[in-house]
Amino acid sequence: DYPTVGGPVTAFTELTPDLYYSDGSLGTLKIPSIGLTVKVYEGTGSAPLLKGAGHFTGTTAWAGNYCVAGHNRGVRNDFGKIHTLHTGDTITLTTPMGTRSYSVTSVTKISDTDTSMLEATADNCITLFTCVENQPAYRWCVRAVSR
């Protein structure tokens, strides 16, 4: 008998300098059903979100659960319509690693303290987050799995 290794198997790609484009972005996110095309930058603070969507630092750069935040109003409202997505809608991510298409599986309202959807996964998926307008204690969370 061999000992069991604890915890589920997860996929993870380390963010390395070669995964940045010359313009400083990590890639481009497209959601045709809401007419969105936005570049993704590293970090979820004010500087990256003023340029586009922000990749959560410490989450995977490709394999596994790729996590992205975006504003939903104001100067940049890139994620203003993500709560209107439907199961089966397509999300496409293009990075130096390639292009991957995802299919939306859930659109949920979560507490702003709920970090469970940021956790690494075994399957390739993308998770989008944005604020809920006039409800600062909540976030919209969209999960889509690789096709």
Region roles according to the model:
Residues 1-147:
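Solvent-exposed, non-transmembrane regions of membrane-associated and secreted proteins
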